[in-house]
Amino acid sequence: MPFKHGTILSIFPVLVMILAALCATAEGSNSGAVRGTVTDPSGAVIPNATVHLINQVSGLDRTATTDATGQFVFANIPFNPYRMTVLANGFTPMSKSFEIRSVVGANLSMVLQVAGSSQTVTVESTGDLVETDPTFHTDVDRELFTKVPLESESSSLSSLVTLSTPGVSADSNGLFHGLGDHASNSFSVDGQSITDQQSKVFSNQIPADSIQSIEVISGAPPAEYGGKTSLVIVATTRSGQGITKPTGSISSSYGSFGSATGGFDLAYGNAKWGNFIEADGLNSGRFLDPPEFTVFHDKGNEQNVFDRVDYSLTPADSIHLDMNYSRSWFQTPNSFDNLNVQNVETTGPNNGSSSSPDFVNVGNTDQRSKIETINISPTYTRIIGSDSVFNLGGFVRRDDYNYFPSGNALADLGPSNLQTSSISQYRTLTNAAVHSDYSYVRGMHNLKIGAQYGQTFLRENDSLGVVESTYNSPCMNAATGNPLPGYASPSACPGGVVIPNTNYLPVLAPYDLTRGGSVYKFSGHTDVKELGLYIEDQIKADNWLFNLGLRGDVYNGLTSATQTEPRVGIAYNIKPTTTVLRVSYARTLETPFNENLVLSSTGCSNAVLSPLLNCTSGVSGTLQPGFRNEFHAGLQQAFGKHLVFSGEYIWKYTHNAFDFSVLGNTPITFPIDWHNSKIPGYALRADVPQVHGFSAYLVASSVAARFFPPQVAGAGATVGQAGLPFRIDHDEKFNQTTHLQYTLSRGKALNGLWGGFNWRYDSGQVAGATPCYGVTDANTPCGNSSTTLGGQPAIAMVDTNIPPTINPVTHASVALPLTADEEFQAGFACNGVKATPTTPLPAVCLASQFTSSLINIPAPNAGDNDHNPQRIAPRDLFDASIGKDNIFHADRYKVNLDLTAINVTDKHALYNFLSTFSGTHYVTPRALTAKITLNF
């Protein structure tokens, strides 16, 4: 679909500002260089001076030595405040604080005084712990996060964001929910924007070993960021520039579940060029988070190669190139329900189309996935004088996703509420874009102007066949209305007790594998075009800082939208009390998720797929972008030199709020739109910078993810159609992470001994499929399961997430029952008797006797979809690491040894239960890993 003349005119004010400054066509680099010269009072240069650069909060710690001309350079320094200390023989040490807020970087002149009787350090400014910045964010450098115990090697970047950032609700398989939204997060890696989902069931993440530092923006997004902005993770990769001696490491680890890793990295270069390369591999018996605490059919492996090249063509011109290839292969974890699957015999006289089909053991479910990701991102940079920098870059990123069914498709049969069809999928997602930005820093102004044009090429190829013999039965029992297995068509129903099924769908008959059918093949494609233009100026006036920005977005895919988006923020630094007050506002255009976007937008107009979806009359098939207003207010407060606190209140209103639904009862998920969402909440962070080897931080948040029906776009959904607000399944009342870290630096034997400790508390996400009792609340979540037993309130063991069907004979409402194993997974018990994988609870249990060890169930008549839904039980998880750096006390080749324990107490806990989007998942059981690293 081409861009229209009116589309460009609608964002003309922004376009004029861009074209006025740029002659070419979003994000620039995420870092700048710190350059400087060290001299004495007469102006003579001082060679061999030691220059030390630190950020106490993020943990960045770098050291350089001045050359023969007294100059030094720190390349690839993320945007942040820093303190620099210079030491030289015969001179008084000097310390200076400054900030990097632009790719222009900083050029410092450090004048050392000749040493006299006093050796007092000269300090030109203070206030390292607080930032006069209107945007709430979290900074973490590699020096800090390498000692944080992380749960998953295959999604360690997600684990790092979850454990270090307030406002993040942890989910399974590397998925995290930022500030109440499903996955509206984006990564900016060295200026390249990645807005597609990075959960390891969708894509391969950039390897954590390639990351130097991250900044997670939780506040109102600056104008340069678009697409998905609930959380913006700004990542700066490692560089070899300026490292004149080959430096790197070789590592290997082994741990629980047979998990083994191996990897190496190497950095080398000089003042003009540099190269950093890393490669790593993982093989694990627990690759994904399974639906059982016991692990089986959960093997997986992953390989990563990342290379960064920096080269200075001239003192003013340089190029930068990122290249990455990742591949993962993994099994879909099985539950006990997936073992020894019973299904119809497809051959012989008693086959699935006969009047009396035989049921046989068709084996275990064996579904698998393979994902390949390739990424190439070059950038050209030109320094224009001492106050301007121009960047021009591009990137291509491609995900190839394959989902493979079991060798015997009939073995893919799962519980009726989870999987009734066998599927295969080959889906590709290719992003290609060019971007440019111009930065100018002079006086009180820090100006940035930029643009990005990109296209996303989506190709979806799905194959589907029904494997449940009663899903589309031609015949039913005349007395009960229950569908019957067997019979090829309604004309084969003999009459009497067996009559034609009035709910039979002839359009599905050719694709019923239990009756000799074949798979249905769906193919869809589209090209999504996006243009983003922005201008922003950071104005510093005494103790004030003003962020003034304007962004224009054009989205043109299966639908089109334009949006002009003001982004503004104000911060004020009360220096006597080291307090920073801030407020900010952003208008954003939230782009639809690309995963299975074509299927979601066209499924209800497809004759075969439409019956599998809960398509609602009046709902637009095509997903629309979301339009959001968000407001933030917060403060940052330093307490002395060893504690800094940040807090933020957030309020977001989104029109067309995104969620996910599922194709029938299959593993294929896709995005949908609800009418709107209202998300208030708060986020807190406290940091204790390193003092005498000890450091700590705490992050905490509470976010209410309130969504409002009706569904307005996409294929069918399963919840929230009562017209009243509900909490989305990733809503969580409260979560927090406390991290403690200590490093010894005394004595030869103890020097380099360190320990790290995490305490993670989650109050629990919504578990809407859990049966409960409630008949008095109009917004009850318990309607499907509320019944009576002997005149007393009782609960039916059914999935309350899935709307009931109407029995064609009795006209009774029929909900899908839970299996014995599903009840066991949820820790259900009736009158103290627990369910087992093979022994279910009674079909109906008195409400007063129904309990769960893993889910909080509302008291009878106390449940409410908005104010008191069913939730996963709160959990406390403890992780610890201990290690020894340079265990052999060597000078060149240093060996590190460390041991990590995840879930030290072996806590049995769930991430979620029968989530519409992802099913049931347990947290990791106790897992021990030993790692050895050779550094050189």
Where are the regions a protein language model picked out?
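Flexible loop and strand-edge segments within Gram-negative outer membrane beta-barrel domains
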Residues: F296-D298, A316-I383, R398-P415, Q419-R427
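Gram-negative outer-membrane beta-barrel transporters
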Residues: K540-L545, Y649-Y653, I672-A769, C845
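C-terminal beta-signal and adjacent terminal beta-strands/loops
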Residues: R760-P858, I872-L877, K884-F936
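Periplasm-facing N-terminal accessory domains of Gram-negative outer-membrane beta-barrel systems
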Residues: P2-F3, F12-F136, S193
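Membrane-embedded beta-barrel scaffold of Gram-negative outer-membrane proteins
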Residues: N391-F395, Y401-Y403, N573, N614-C615, ...
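Surface-exposed extracellular loop regions of Gram-negative outer-membrane beta-barrel proteins
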Residues: S335-D337, L558, Y572, P576-E630, ...
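Periplasmic N-terminal accessory/gating domains of Gram-negative outer-membrane beta-barrel systems
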Residues: F91-Q113, S117-P222, V232, T236-G240, ...
